[in-house]
């Protein structure tokens, strides 16, 4: 996407960080109240670590593609899982989730960290996986996880078979 400007807004509100707008101008919102509470309980280093992680996540949203032909952003859908899983995969890939927070269980459709850790694990099978996965959102219509995995890894794989392999890896 043609992002020309990113506006970062630190606001005196409750709430979670979020990306707003569409290219060419994207906004990232962050709560100063959350920063204050976190600093009191965690100290400066942990707040800085978390803030950088949030920025990686939200900046990923600014640049990532959106799956075509499957509706829009709604929790529990493959569209939502793609969007939030990809953002957490990039965050983890860049060192802003501790590896010990990656646990067996859940489902690849859980989104956020669970999906993000799974997607990042797939970079061990193909170092260019995250880029290819993002690009698949334009190349496959209608898009689905299974179609994307087959597109990247070959017709013999399914998302479920890769998930089972990932779960076995986590249990080692």
Q: What is the predicted function of each stretch?
A:
Residues 13-16, 34-37, 62, 69-70, ...:
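Solvent-exposed loop/turn segments at secondary-structure junctions
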Residues 74-116:
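Post-HExxH zinc-binding segment in Zn-dependent metallohydrolases
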């Amino acid at each position: 996407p043609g992002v020309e400007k990113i506006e970062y807004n630190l606001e005196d509100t409750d709430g979670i960080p979020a990306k707003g707008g569409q290219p060419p101008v994207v906004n990232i919102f962050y709560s100063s109240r959350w920063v204050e509470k976190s600093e009191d309980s965690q100290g400066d280093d942990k707040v800085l670590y978390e803030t950088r992680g949030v920025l990686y996540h939200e900046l990923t949203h600014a640049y990532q593609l959106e799956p075509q032909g499957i509706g829009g952003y709604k929790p529990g859908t493959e569209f939502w899982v793609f969007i939030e899983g990809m953002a957490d995969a990039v965050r983890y890939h860049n060192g802003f989730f501790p590896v010990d927070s990656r646990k067996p269980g859940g489902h690849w459709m859980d989104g956020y960290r669970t999906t993000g850790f799974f997607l990042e694990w797939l970079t061990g099978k193909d170092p260019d996986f995250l880029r290819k996965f993002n690009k698949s959102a334009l190349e496959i219509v209608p898009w689905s996880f299974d179609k994307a995995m087959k597109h990247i890894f070959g017709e013999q794989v399914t998302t479920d078979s890769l998930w089972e392999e990932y779960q076995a890896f986590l249990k080692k």
